[in-house]
């Protein structure tokens, strides 16, 4: 029996509707909308598309989303000055610096300069540390948060489940594992250099794949009845957008699966909007 499809577009719309209602309550209580600043250095076509989408969708739910497009020649010092300005602006609740940055700019220096309370990408060491220690008050990266919402919408019981995360990036793999641990799953982190990766994946009740390798996971890598979350975004030889999972083969064994496109992607931006609202609420609550 073919797997059920976890429709990220539909669930993302549900999240956006919830955020829109929350923003309206925030404005009524505080007289201003939550503010999100997206900072872009240069004119990389993919980054331009992503940042404009974030700006547009923020404004659609009532968040004051603004894109700061800086020249490609921007120096690290100039970018740090921009971040410092946004840190000091009380109307800004969320700051997102679009990655990747030009090679001459140290990404860690820029990310570390963002006020942790405004770090809606969840990449500041303070937020990463709080998440790793299982302590409240931090901000988790948006893609793993979106994946957790997908699992919740599918009604997947995580407590006691065997979860395998293929990928170890700071943006997806590592925080995804921490969020699953917090829900009492038994978690293994793997990657493309893991020995016997196929055997490990076959043990997973929940498999989250963020390896960045097209169709890495085949149908015979999947435990019957598993839930498969495909975070990958790749182009095949024909230029078609595909995930890290061989969708047609895997859906014959899985119980639930996310498509690419239309699965995790829409949830990432929806989760960014939700995170921005939560950051705004947390900031005003501390005053």
Curated annotation (Swiss-Prot):
GO molecular function: methenyltetrahydrofolate cyclohydrolase activity; methylenetetrahydrofolate dehydrogenase (NADP+) activity
InterPro entries found in the cross-reference section: Aminoacid_DH-like_N_sf (IPR046346), NAD(P)-bd_dom_sf (IPR036291), THF_DH/CycHdrlase (IPR000672), THF_DH/CycHdrlase_cat_dom (IPR020630), THF_DH/CycHdrlase_CS (IPR020867), THF_DH/CycHdrlase_NAD-bd_dom (IPR020631)
UniProt-listed GO biological process terms: L-histidine biosynthetic process; methionine biosynthetic process; purine nucleotide biosynthetic process; tetrahydrofolate interconversion
Catalytic activity: (6R)-5,10-methylene-5,6,7,8-tetrahydrofolate + NADP(+) = (6R)-5,10-methenyltetrahydrofolate + NADPH; (6R)-5,10-methenyltetrahydrofolate + H2O = (6R)-10-formyltetrahydrofolate + H(+)
Cystine crosslinks: none
GO cellular component terms, A-Z: cytosol
Biological pathway: One-carbon metabolism; tetrahydrofolate interconversion
Binding site for NADP(+): 167-169, 192
Keywords per UniProt: Amino-acid biosynthesis, Histidine biosynthesis, Hydrolase, Methionine biosynthesis, Multifunctional enzyme, NADP, One-carbon metabolism, Oxidoreductase, Purine biosynthesis
Pfam families to which the protein is assigned, alphabetical: THF_DHG_CYH, THF_DHG_CYH_C
EC assignment: 1.5.1.5, 3.5.4.9
Quaternary structure (record): Homodimer.
Function as written in the Swiss-Prot or TrEMBL entry: Catalyzes the oxidation of 5,10-methylenetetrahydrofolate to 5,10-methenyltetrahydrofolate and then the hydrolysis of 5,10-methenyltetrahydrofolate to 10-formyltetrahydrofolate.
UniProt family annotation: Belongs to the tetrahydrofolate dehydrogenase/cyclohydrolase family.
Protein name: Bifunctional protein FolD
Source organism (scientific name): Sorangium cellulosum (strain So ce56) (Polyangium cellulosum (strain So ce56))
């Amino acid at each position: 029996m073919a797997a059920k499809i976890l429709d990220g577009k539909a669930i993302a719309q549900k999240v956006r509707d919830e955020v829109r209602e929350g923003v309206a309550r925030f404005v009524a209580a505080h007289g201003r909308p939550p503010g999100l600043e997206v900072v872009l250095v240069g004119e990389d076509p993919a980054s331009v598309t992503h940042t404009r989408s974030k700006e547009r969708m923020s404004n659609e739910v009532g968040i004051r989303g603004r894109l700061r497009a800086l020249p490609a020649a921007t120096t690290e010092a100039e970018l740090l000055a921009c971040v410092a300005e946004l840190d000091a602006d009380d109307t800004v609740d969320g700051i997102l610096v679009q990655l990747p940055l030009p090679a001459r700019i140290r990404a860690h220096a820029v990310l570390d300069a963002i006020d942790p309370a405004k770090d809606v990408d969840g990449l500041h060491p303070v937020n990463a540390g709080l998440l790793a220690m299982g302590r409240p008050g931090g901000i988790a990266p948006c893609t793993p948060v979106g994946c957790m919402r997908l699992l919740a919408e599918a009604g997947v019981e995580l407590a006691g489940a065997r979860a395998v995360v293929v990928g170890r990036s700071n943006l997806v793999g590592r925080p995804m594992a921490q969020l699953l641990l917090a829900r009492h799953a038994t978690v293994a982190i793997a990657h493309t250099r893991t020995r016997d990766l196929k055997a490990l994946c076959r043990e997973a009740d929940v498999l989250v794949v963020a390896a960045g390798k097209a169709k890495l996971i085949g149908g015979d890598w999947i435990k019957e009845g598993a839930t498969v979350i495909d975070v990958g975004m790749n182009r095949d030889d024909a230029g078609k957008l595909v995930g890290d999972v061989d969708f047609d083969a895997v859906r014959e064994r899985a119980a639930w699966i996310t498509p690419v496109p239309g699965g995790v992607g829409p949830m990432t931006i929806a989760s960014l909007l939700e995170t921005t609202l939560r950051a705004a609420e947390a900031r005003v609550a501390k005053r």
